[in-house]
């Protein structure tokens, strides 16, 4: 029999129908809304946006937060390492609140901000405690959107990556390759390979002796990420909210390719994830083919949907601008276009 923490909370069917049939929370961008299923973020789905610092992850979160507040839904914003930019959010709300209405009917920005709850969770313990007790939140039935800004920071603080981690993984892969090669080798090469495996075993022993905590740290990090993923999946299933998570990228050195950026969270994070959007930029001042100059690279951002449901598959790169009034579409670039960025799209997949 499953314990109470592993059982989903039963909910009326009518509430589930109303939640999943409700319109999504848009980005004010047709390209991004289409990439997330046609109407933006939908309730019951976990979406992630990852990218290097300054790529516009928080700007996307602010945009959908403003649209969710304007729709009358309550929003919970979890801040980890930096406070929510309230002035930018207020500016987005002011730009969308009609100014031609009568004073009695006009929706005040402060009234909209009353629907926003900010939770400060600077470390992993705070994150886990908040997610485990999410069903005890006030106004639970009114919550439509959950934002977790920079989830990767608490994980990094709890289990920081180090060069020993990559050395351990590299040695483990090399040992596995040598073992498989030894099994399929011919008889005349058996003696030579056994000597190599003997040295490899000594290296493994020395490595384990000097880095006894490396494997434990890696396993604990993976377990923590898996726990967060399971808790978020439980929240979407029981509370019918849309979850939007922003994360950072990390560098990885690949033989023959060099350094590349990959999402920080490991592959077990993808099990319950519905959408993963990767942001990047191009530092170019070239003109487009039609002769029109492109916007400044400081405002223009590119995106690629690294994971999405098969029914929503879109093989294209997205380009949008970050402006003071919000997000604006620029263009959609097919992936087979001759104008490709320097780093391959596949290099961004974990």
Swiss-Prot record:
Compartments, as annotated in UniProt: Nucleus
GO biological process, one term: double-strand break repair via homologous recombination
GO annotations of cellular component type: cytosol; nucleus; Rad51B-Rad51C-Rad51D-XRCC2 complex; Rad51C-XRCC3 complex; replication fork; site of double-strand break
MF terms (GO), sorted A to Z: ATP binding; ATP hydrolysis activity; ATP-dependent DNA damage sensor activity; DNA binding
Residues bound to ATP: 51-58
UniProt keyword annotation of Repeat present: no
SUPFAM superfamilies on file: P-loop containing nucleoside triphosphate hydrolases
Coiled coil: none
Entries under PROSITE patterns matching the protein: RECA_2
UniProt-listed InterPro entries: HR_Repair_Mediator, P-loop_NTPase, RecA_ATP-bd
Domain of life where this protein originates: Eukaryota
Keywords: ATP-binding, DNA damage, DNA repair, Nucleotide-binding, Nucleus
Record region (Disordered): 331-350
Physiological role: Required for radiation resistance and meiotic viability and acts in recombination and recombinational DNA repair pathways.
Family: Belongs to the RecA family. RAD55 subfamily.
Record protein name field: DNA repair protein rhp55
